[in-house]
From Swiss-Prot:
Protein encoded by which gene: citE
Reactions listed under catalytic activity: citrate = oxaloacetate + acetate; (3S)-citryl-CoA = oxaloacetate + acetyl-CoA
A Pfam family: HpcH_HpaI
Organism: Escherichia coli (strain K12)
Intracellular or extracellular location(s): Cytoplasm
Lineage of source species: Bacteria, Pseudomonadati, Pseudomonadota, Gammaproteobacteria, Enterobacterales
Family under the similarity heading: Belongs to the HpcH/HpaI aldolase family. Citrate lyase beta subunit subfamily.
Record protein name field: Citrate lyase subunit beta
Length: 302
C-alpha cells in the first residue's frame, strides 16, 4: 500500500529532473535556485569512492533544509547490495526524500528488495509508511527485456527511466546523434511504463555545450511520448521546458475542443462535434493535456 500523498504525487509534471552531484557542496547547497521540476541528488556514479560518506551526509542535511521543502527531491542511491546501499537508504528516507532512484534495475526483485528496506526504515523513523516513491532506472539489455515486469513491480513506482551509457556499452556500440541504437530501449521503456500507468523518463544528454544536439534529442523523445528527461546541466532546463510547451495554434485548437466537450456535457449529448467532425475521448484528453502544459510552461517560443 502507498500513502495518499504519494498517490497524489505520482502524476505530477516531471519534464526535467536535474542531477545534483552529492559530493559537490556548492550545488547541493544552492540547487534550489534552478527551475527544474525535480532535483535529483546523486550518491552513485558522480561520487568518488572516498567521498561517498561525505556526500551522503550533505544530501541528508540538504533534504531537511526549508528551501527544498516545496521542490520534489529525488535521490539516486547506490545499489542495495553495495557497501553503501543500506546507509544511503537510511539517510535519504529519514531525511525526507520524496523519491528514491534505484540504479541498474535488472529485475522486478530488485524493486521489491529496495521497497522492503524502505518500508522498514519508514516504520523505524516514524515516517508515514508508503510515502516514499520509487523510480527505477533500467540500464542494461537484461533490464530492457524485463521492463514490463519491473514497471509493474511496486505501487511505489512513479516511473521508470532509461540509463543509456551502461546500456550502450553492453550493446558493444556507442551513442550517435540520431540515437538509432537507443530506439528499441526507449520504446520498451515507454510501453512498459504506459502499461503500468506510470511515467517514462529519458536518459541524459551529456554534451552540455551542444544545444542543437540536445534539442534534437529532446524533440525526438517528446514525440515518442516520454514525460521528461534527466538533465546534467541547469542550462538545459529552460530549453526542455520550452520544447514541452505547446504552440499558440495548439492551444487555440485545444481550447475549442474542450469547450465543445463541455458544451456537449451540459446539453446531455453523447457525441462531441467540432466544425462538423466528431471528437472522441482521446482527442479531448489530449486537448486537456495541451492546456495544462500551457498553464505550466506558457506558449512555446519558436
Amino acid at each position: 500500500m502507498i500513502s495518499a500523498s504519494l498517490q497524489q504525487r505520482k502524476t505530477r509534471t516531471r519534464r526535467s529532473m536535474l542531477f545534483v552531484p552529492g559530493a559537490n557542496a556548492a550545488m547541493v547547497s544552492n540547487s534550489f535556485i534552478y527551475p527544474a521540476d525535480a532535483l535529483m541528488f546523486d550518491l552513485e556514479d558522480s561520487v568518488a569512492l572516498r567521498e561517498k560518506d561525505t556526500a551522503r551526509r550533505m544530501v541528508y542535511h540538504a533534504l531537511q533544509h526549508p528551501l527544498y521543502r516545496d521542490i520534489e527531491t529525488i535521490v539516486r542511491v547506490n545499489a542495495l547490495d553495495s557497501e553503501w546501499g543500506v546507509n544511503d537508504l537510511e539517510a535519504v528516507v529519514r531525511g525526507g526524500a520524496d523519491v528514491v532512484r534505484l540504479p541498474k534495475t535488472d529485475t522486478a526483485q530488485d524493486v521489491l528488495d529496495i521497497e522492503k528496506e524502505i518500508l522498514r526504515i519508514e516504520k523505524a523513523c516514524g515516517r508515514e509508511p508508503g510515502s516514499t516513491g520509487l523510480l527505477a532506472a533500467i540500464e542494461s539489455p537484461l533490464g530492457i527485456t524485463r521492463a514490463v515486469e519491473i514497471a509493474h513491480a511496486s505501487e511505489r513506482l512513479i516511473g521508470i527511466a532509461l540509463g543509456a551509457e551502461d546500456y550502450v556499452r553492453n550493446l558493444r556500440t556507442e551513442r550517435s546523434p540520431e540515437g538509432t541504437e537507443l530506439l528499441f530501449a526507449r520504446c520498451s521503456i515507454l510501453q512498459a511504463a504506459r502499461s503500468a500507468g506510470i511515467q517514462a523518463f529519458d536518459t541524459v544528454y551529456s554534451d552540455a555545450n551542444n544545444e542543437a544536439g540536445f534539442l534534437q534529442e529532446a524533440a525526438h523523445i517528446k514525440q515518442l511520448g516520454f514525460d521528461g528527461k534527466s538533465l546534467i546541466n541547469p542550462r538545459q532546463i529552460d530549453l526542455l521546458h520550452n520544447l514541452y510547451a505547446p504552440t499558440q495554434k495548439e492551444v487555440d485548437h485545444a481550447r475549442r475542443v474542450v469547450e465543445a466537450a463541455e458544451a456537449a456535457a451540459r446539453e446531455g449529448l453523447g457525441v462531441v462535434s467540432l466544425n462538423g467532425k466528431m471528437v472522441d475521448g482521446p482527442v479531448i484528453d489530449r486537448a486537456r493535456l495541451v492546456l495544462s502544459r500551457a498553464e505550466l510552461s506558457g506558449i512555446r517560443e519558436e
